[in-house]
Structure formats: structure tokens, C-alpha cells
A protein has these predicted regions:
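N-terminal domain-onset segments
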Residues: 1-70, 97, 191, 198-214
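Selective for proline/serine-rich intrinsically disordered segments
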Residues: 4, 14, 49, 73, ...
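Internal, well-folded beta-alpha domain core
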Residues: 29, 61-63, 77-214
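Solvent-exposed, well-ordered amphipathic alpha-helical segments
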Residues: 36-48, 75-79, 118, 123
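Short, surface-exposed coil-to-beta transition loops
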Residues: 70-72, 85
Length: 214
């Protein structure tokens, strides 16, 4: 059983099998963040959290399962020395990627349709939800190196934790967002937010490990 919101629920289990991590990939992306809504905490993990919502649209130009697009969001961040995402909503347009997310990282991936350019106007549409972004990059292109950690709740109170490490180039951006869905409309704020665009990058998502608590 995966920790998820209704937009990422999926009863299907016969997805094509994906290779194990690490998953290296070339990426372009738009990321944005905002102060969490009053309702966001009920869709986040238990334990200490920070009231910051982090979301992103990602274009994987290549990967172990081929090219695909992705949208994901964390309603709040886990409070830690380095804050971590907890992702109850994530969708892709690759069946093997759905398998990989669910099997290797406990990420509740579902299938969706994508259109546009992540560095400009982009959209993701599922069965009963949609997210649209318009990224407006500003300022110079700068180098970036770091990682994003996600820690997914699993039965028994533990979490499954993994890190995606990135090296590439980015620009500051203002990202305008519209979201519809039974829960997305309650915690993914519409409007224009601070963000960045990854204009080019190499990313590698490593194997997850179970930790007793965060």
C-alpha cells in the first residue's frame, strides 16, 4: 500500500518492469515553492514538518526507461538537517517509470498526458486532475549542483528515503500555476510563485533505504 492522495491512486499492477536504480538521466525542469496552505498538513506526513510546498515539472530527455515527463509535489517538507520531500502526488507518461517509482522508491506514480515545454508553458492532465505551469526565466544562467531527498512513509511508521543528485545549469524564474483536483486544489496554490528552471542537467536517483523515523 502506497502513501498517496486520490489523484495518484491506481489499482493497476501490470506495468512493464523497470531496471533497478541508480537511474541516471538528462533533465530540464521547472521547480516552484510557496508557503503551505492551511489544508496542506493533512496531506503531508506525520512528524515535524516545514510549511513549505515544493513542486516541479520535469522533462527527462533520456533515462533507463527512455524519455518521459513528470509532475510531482510535496505538500509540506519534512523537518530535518536537510529538509526532505514527502510526495503523495506524482504522475508520468511512461509505463515503466510508473513501475519504477512504485517498486523502487514507493512513489505513487500514475499515468498522465503532458503537453508543452517545461521551460515555458507546460501542462499535465490526469483522469480527474490537471496542473498547468508557465515559467518565466529571469537573469543569468548559473551552475547548480546538489540533491533533492524524498522520504516516503511506509507501513509500520518507517520511511523509505532516497536522493536524486543533480549537476547542471539553472535560472531564477517566476512560475505561474493552475491546479485542479479533489485535493490538489486545496494545497497546490494557484498564482505566480518563486522558482527556478533547470535549463540543462544530469541527474541520478539512487537506491532507497528504510529508516526507522525522520
Amino acid at each position: 500500500v502506497l502513501w498517496t492522495v486520490p489523484e495518484s491512486e491506481d489499482e493497476r499492477t501490470d506495468y512493464p518492469v523497470s531496471p533497478p536504480p541508480p537511474w541516471p538521466a538528462s533533465v530540464r525542469a521547472a521547480l516552484w515553492w510557496h508557503r503551505s496552505t492551511p489544508d496542506a498538513s493533512q496531506y503531508g506526513p506525520t512528524g515535524a514538518t516545514l510549511p513549505i510546498t515544493l513542486a516541479m515539472m520535469v522533462d527527462y530527455l533520456d533515462s533507463p526507461v527512455g524519455p518521459y515527463r513528470e509532475v510531482l509535489a510535496s505538500p509540506v517538507l519534512r523537518r530535518d538537517l536537510i529538509p526532505a520531500m514527502a510526495v503523495p502526488f506524482i504522475a508520468v507518461d511512461s509505463e515503466p517509470s510508473v513501475h519504477g517509482g512504485r517498486e523502487h522508491w514507493k512513489l505513487p506514480k500514475v499515468l498522465a498526458k503532458f503537453d508543452g515545454d517545461v521551460l515555458g508553458d507546460f501542462s499535465a492532465t490526469g483522469a480527474r486532475w490537471s496542473v498547468a505551469t508557465s515559467a518565466a526565466p529571469k537573469g543569468p544562467e548559473l551552475p547548480v549542483a546538489g540533491g533533492l531527498t524524498f522520504a516516503q512513509p511506509i507501513p509500520g511508521g518507517a520511511v523509505e528515503r532516497a536522493t536524486a543528485r543533480l549537476r547542471g545549469k539553472f535560472r531564477y524564474a517566476r512560475v505561474t500555476v493552475a491546479a485542479e483536483g479533489s485535493t490538489l486544489s486545496r494545497w497546490l496554490r494557484p498564482g505566480t510563485h518563486h522558482g527556478i528552471v533547470i535549463t540543462s542537467g544530469r541527474m541520478s536517483t539512487g537506491a532507497s533505504r528504510v529508516v526507522s523515523r525522520m
